[in-house]
């Protein structure tokens, strides 16, 4: 079934990095915000790498992201998808990242998982390179489907985000 991305990107003029997922899950679409599935470890990973308490409400999560200069969005603005599985995504239409790049000083884009990185490489590479001078960096997915990675291992792999935020 064809789905259109229901959320706006989260960023402000101070955003230094952008984290792109692939496309919102069924649970996220139902609850109206990024990474709303409690099994997804995105928010726990960010809290872990930044040594902060876990944000609970949507407002707290937005404030957390902006306070830490993190922009979030997804690489696809629409796609055909059954359920939440990235493996079942087809007919991908890439997101337009220009509003983020023109409204913030993003120095690095991070792709949350293989599908997000694949979309970045296939459709968004030039836009990302032109804006940041670097290709999107692939991070292991925080999705519960990525059972090969424990929370501790994800935090370790995602420390590059905290390092990028600290530098400069």
Locate the predicted segments by residue.
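Short, glycine/serine-rich, charged loops/turns that create anion-binding
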Residues: 24-27, 77, 116, 143
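Short, surface-exposed acidic-centric catalytic microdomains
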Residues: 27-88
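Pocket-edge structural micro-motifs
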Residues: 22, 74, 140
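Internal catalytic-core helix/loop-beta-alpha segment
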Residues: 67-118
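Short, hydrophobic/glycine-enriched beta-strand segments
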Residues: 16-22
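Residue-level signal for well-ordered alpha-helical scaffold segments within enzymatic catalytic domains
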Residues: 44-48, 99, 122
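C-terminal capping/extension of enzyme domains
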Residues: 1-16, 37-38, 83-98, 121-168
